[in-house]
């Protein structure tokens, strides 16, 4: 059964396949040298860096906040990723929310995003984030349904972003 886990090297091959899929938009990977990450040692360093982002003192770009990065995996298969931002900047409050997630294209339309968000809520409780702000694009009907299935209550729309508050408890 698929589960949210901290980033792990055991899905190296599948992760590389996922980011190479047509229609996958890994904006979160824009600054990554994907060719370099084919090397297991380099990938292990990347994984360690992902894990470290949950700490307050980890190096990160200006304006970024500590975040717990989780990968949704089934055995050695990478299905998607989810990030929990530990606090909100003004931009995150207005547009980005506490949680961001995506599912690799070949795994979409199987309920994975719904399950990912459901499994993320206990992590949010441990981080004392309750309620959880989750946003989606105005035209992203699938994501809107995911958020509403998780109990999200619509707050408002800001410049094309729908904002929902999801109870973590």
Residue positions per predicted region:
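Conserved GNAT acetyl-CoA-binding A-motif
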Residues: 124-135
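Active-site acidic-Proline motif in GNAT/NAT acetyltransferases
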Residues: 101-110, 139
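Conserved active-site alpha-helix within GNAT-family acetyltransferase domains
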Residues: 114, 138-156
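GNAT-family acyltransferases
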Residues: 1-98, 102-105, 155-169
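Conserved acetyl-CoA pyrophosphate-binding loop and the N-cap/start of the following alpha-helix
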Residues: 107, 111-119
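Short glycine-rich hinge loops at helix-strand junctions in the catalytic core
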Residues: 111, 128, 151
């Amino acid at each position: 059964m698929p589960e949210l886990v901290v980033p792990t090297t055991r899905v190296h091959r599948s992760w590389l396949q996922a980011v190479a899929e047509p229609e996958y938009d890994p904006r979160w990977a824009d600054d990554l040298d994907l060719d370099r990450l084919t090397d297991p040692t380099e990938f292990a360093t990347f994984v360690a860096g992902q894990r470290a982002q949950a700490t307050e003192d980890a190096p990160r770009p200006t304006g970024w906040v500590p975040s717990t990065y989780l990968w949704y995996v089934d055995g050695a298969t990478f299905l998607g990723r989810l990030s929990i931002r530990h606090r909100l900047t003004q931009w995150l409050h207005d547009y980005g929310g506490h949680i961001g997630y995506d599912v690799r294209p070949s795994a979409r339309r199987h309920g994975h995003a719904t399950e990912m968000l459901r499994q993320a809520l206990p992590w949010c409780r441990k981080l004392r984030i309750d309620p959880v702000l989750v946003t989606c694009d105005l035209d992203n009907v699938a994501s809107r349904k995911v958020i509403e299935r998780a109990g999200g209550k619509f707050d408002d729309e800001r410049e094309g972003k729908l904002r929902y508050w999801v109870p973590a408890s």
